[in-house]
Amino acid sequence: MILSDEKCDFLESIASFLSPKDVELVFVDSKEMQEINLEQRKQDKTTDVLSFPLENIDESLPLGSVVINVDLAKEKAKELGHSYEEEISLLFIHAMLHLLGFDHENDNGEMREKEKELIEHFNLPKSLIVRTLED
Protein backbone atom coordinates (compact mmCIF):
# COMPACT_ATOMS: atom_id res chain seq x y z
CA MET A 1 0.00 0.00 0.00
CA ILE A 2 1.43 3.37 -1.02
CA LEU A 3 -0.72 5.43 1.37
CA SER A 4 -3.05 4.59 4.22
CA ASP A 5 -6.76 5.30 3.88
CA GLU A 6 -6.32 8.19 6.32
CA LYS A 7 -3.62 9.77 4.15
CA CYS A 8 -5.72 9.24 1.01
CA ASP A 9 -8.56 11.04 2.77
CA PHE A 10 -6.17 13.88 3.59
CA LEU A 11 -5.21 14.25 -0.09
CA GLU A 12 -8.90 14.18 -0.96
CA SER A 13 -9.48 17.04 1.48
CA ILE A 14 -6.73 19.07 -0.21
CA ALA A 15 -8.21 18.42 -3.65
CA SER A 16 -11.74 19.28 -2.48
CA PHE A 17 -10.51 22.47 -0.84
CA LEU A 18 -9.01 23.61 -4.16
CA SER A 19 -11.57 22.37 -6.67
CA PRO A 20 -14.91 20.54 -6.82
CA LYS A 21 -13.65 18.54 -9.80
CA ASP A 22 -12.16 15.04 -9.60
CA VAL A 23 -8.42 14.52 -9.96
CA GLU A 24 -6.64 11.35 -11.04
CA LEU A 25 -3.67 10.50 -8.79
CA VAL A 26 -1.04 8.07 -10.08
CA PHE A 27 1.99 6.78 -8.18
CA VAL A 28 5.05 5.60 -10.13
CA ASP A 29 8.69 4.74 -9.52
CA SER A 30 11.65 6.72 -10.90
CA LYS A 31 11.96 4.61 -14.04
CA GLU A 32 8.29 5.03 -14.94
CA MET A 33 8.47 8.76 -14.22
CA GLN A 34 11.48 9.12 -16.52
CA GLU A 35 9.53 7.38 -19.30
CA ILE A 36 6.50 9.64 -18.80
CA ASN A 37 8.69 12.74 -18.67
CA LEU A 38 10.43 11.75 -21.91
CA GLU A 39 7.17 10.93 -23.68
CA GLN A 40 5.22 13.98 -22.51
CA ARG A 41 7.87 16.67 -22.04
CA LYS A 42 10.81 15.39 -24.11
CA GLN A 43 13.03 15.42 -21.01
CA ASP A 44 14.97 12.20 -20.50
CA LYS A 45 15.20 12.40 -16.73
CA THR A 46 13.07 11.56 -13.75
CA THR A 47 11.28 14.19 -11.69
CA ASP A 48 9.27 14.27 -8.48
CA VAL A 49 5.82 15.23 -9.77
CA LEU A 50 4.03 15.97 -13.03
CA SER A 51 0.57 17.32 -13.67
CA PHE A 52 -1.54 16.98 -16.79
CA PRO A 53 -4.55 19.30 -16.93
CA LEU A 54 -7.52 18.38 -19.07
CA GLU A 55 -8.90 20.98 -21.39
CA ASN A 56 -11.91 22.83 -20.03
CA ILE A 57 -14.17 21.72 -22.86
CA ASP A 58 -16.56 19.83 -20.62
CA GLU A 59 -17.32 20.73 -17.01
CA SER A 60 -18.00 17.06 -16.21
CA LEU A 61 -14.40 16.09 -16.98
CA PRO A 62 -11.87 15.73 -14.16
CA LEU A 63 -9.48 18.60 -13.53
CA GLY A 64 -6.59 16.44 -14.71
CA SER A 65 -3.97 13.95 -13.56
CA VAL A 66 -1.20 14.14 -10.99
CA VAL A 67 1.72 11.70 -11.25
CA ILE A 68 3.98 11.36 -8.20
CA ASN A 69 7.34 9.61 -8.10
CA VAL A 70 7.33 7.61 -4.86
CA ASP A 71 11.07 6.90 -5.03
CA LEU A 72 11.98 10.59 -5.07
CA ALA A 73 9.29 11.37 -2.49
CA LYS A 74 10.89 8.90 -0.07
CA GLU A 75 14.38 10.31 -0.73
CA LYS A 76 13.31 13.94 -0.33
CA ALA A 77 11.34 13.22 2.85
CA LYS A 78 14.38 11.58 4.41
CA GLU A 79 16.67 14.39 3.25
CA LEU A 80 14.38 17.10 4.65
CA GLY A 81 13.45 15.30 7.85
CA HIS A 82 9.72 14.86 7.45
CA SER A 83 7.46 11.92 6.65
CA TYR A 84 6.91 10.31 3.27
CA GLU A 85 3.20 11.10 3.58
CA GLU A 86 3.95 14.77 4.19
CA GLU A 87 6.18 14.85 1.12
CA ILE A 88 3.42 13.27 -0.97
CA SER A 89 1.03 15.96 0.32
CA LEU A 90 3.47 18.75 -0.57
CA LEU A 91 3.95 17.38 -4.08
CA PHE A 92 0.20 16.98 -4.48
CA ILE A 93 -0.41 20.62 -3.53
CA HIS A 94 2.24 21.73 -6.02
CA ALA A 95 0.69 19.66 -8.81
CA MET A 96 -2.87 20.73 -7.98
CA LEU A 97 -1.87 24.36 -8.35
CA HIS A 98 -0.44 23.60 -11.78
CA LEU A 99 -3.74 21.92 -12.72
CA LEU A 100 -5.51 25.10 -11.66
CA GLY A 101 -3.35 27.18 -13.99
CA PHE A 102 -0.58 28.43 -11.71
CA ASP A 103 2.93 28.43 -13.21
CA HIS A 104 5.88 29.30 -10.96
CA GLU A 105 8.19 29.58 -13.97
CA ASN A 106 6.19 32.44 -15.49
CA ASP A 107 4.35 34.20 -12.67
CA ASN A 108 5.46 36.84 -10.19
CA GLY A 109 5.46 34.57 -7.16
CA GLU A 110 1.71 33.95 -7.05
CA MET A 111 2.09 30.17 -7.10
CA ARG A 112 4.69 30.18 -4.32
CA GLU A 113 2.46 32.44 -2.22
CA LYS A 114 -0.53 30.12 -2.74
CA GLU A 115 1.64 27.09 -1.85
CA LYS A 116 2.67 28.84 1.36
CA GLU A 117 -0.96 29.55 2.27
CA LEU A 118 -1.98 25.94 1.63
CA ILE A 119 0.99 24.48 3.50
CA GLU A 120 0.09 26.58 6.52
CA HIS A 121 -3.63 25.80 6.19
CA PHE A 122 -3.00 22.04 6.10
CA ASN A 123 -0.25 22.22 8.74
CA LEU A 124 2.46 20.71 6.54
CA PRO A 125 6.25 21.15 6.80
CA LYS A 126 7.54 24.32 5.20
CA SER A 127 10.26 22.49 3.26
CA LEU A 128 8.51 23.02 -0.09
CA ILE A 129 8.68 26.77 0.46
CA VAL A 130 12.35 26.65 1.45
CA ARG A 131 13.46 24.46 -1.44
CA THR A 132 11.45 26.36 -4.06
CA LEU A 133 13.00 29.63 -2.96
CA GLU A 134 16.36 28.05 -3.76
CA ASP A 135 15.26 27.16 -7.33
Curated annotation (Swiss-Prot):
GO terms for biological process: rRNA processing. Its main location: cytoplasm. The keyword Secreted does not apply. Its cofactor is Zn(2+). The keyword Hydrolase applies. Keywords: Cytoplasm, Endonuclease, Hydrolase, Metal-binding, Nuclease, Ribosome biogenesis, rRNA processing, Zinc. Belongs to the endoribonuclease YbeY family. This is Endoribonuclease YbeY. PANTHER family: ENDORIBONUCLEASE YBEY, CHLOROPLASTIC (PTHR46986:SF1).
